[in-house]
Amino acid sequence: MKYLHTICLLFIFVARGNSRSCDFCHNIGKECDGYEKECSSPEDVCGKVLLEISSASLSVRTVHKNCFSSSVCKLEQFDVNIGHHSYIRGRINCCEKEQCEDRPFPGLPLSQPNGYYCPGALGLFTEDSTEFEAICKGTETKCINIVGHRHEDFPGDISYNLKGCISSCPLLSLSNATHEENRNYLEKVECKDAFQLARL
């Protein structure tokens, strides 16, 4: 249930979205039905986000439809190894029309540890989360660190912190993050080379 609760809140990771109307809904699974809402600046496109959190044999997916900032759409997808055999994956598709096509989730590759590691963490409602060692695998040679907060009418202010191994640095930075009247704010976006494990 902890992972289920976590993934349902992860839509805060992407900004919500001038006078365009988009579908708005959240649900567990691959599809959701909601209502149409009018977007406010700087959110200028409709979007659909699929999120997945995988831990060992357990995998849970959620879908989120909303208004988005086109700058956040540049992220397109992310696969973060947060350690303890757990991954957080997202597929973001923005479109001019109401029905956005899905970006599929390929199966996780059966990759072996590659001799690198990163700090791993997943924190919600806090910017300071307990770190542990995430052992990088396959092509994962970068460390990602994202810290921010978002204000929602419910449940209110939500802080978040995501750290782990990633294959390449995403096109997401403080310069193209949206600052919508303090609704969504990225405090830190870091992507650097992973650390090499000590050889025995």
Swiss-Prot record:
What InterPro entries does the entry give? CNF-like_PLA2_Inhibitor, LY6_UPA_recep-like, PLipase_A2-inh_b-type, PLipase_A2_inh_N, Snake_toxin-like_sf
Cysteine pairs bridged by disulfides in the record = C22-C46, C25-C32, C39-C67, C73-C94, C95-C100, C118-C143, C136-C165
PTM summary: N-glycosylated. The glycosidic chain may contain superficial sialic acid residues.
Query: What protein name is recorded for this chain?
Result: Phospholipase A2 inhibitor CgMIP-I
Q: Which Pfam families match?
A: PLA2_inh, UPAR_LY6
Q: Which family does it belong to?
A: Belongs to the CNF-like-inhibitor family.
What is the organism field in this record? Cerrophidion godmani (Porthidium godmani)
Cytoplasm listed as a keyword: no
Listed under GO cellular component are: extracellular region
Q: Where does this polypeptide localize?
A: Secreted
Q: Share what the entry says about its subunit structure, partners included.
A: Homomer of 110 kDa composed of 20-25-kDa subunits.
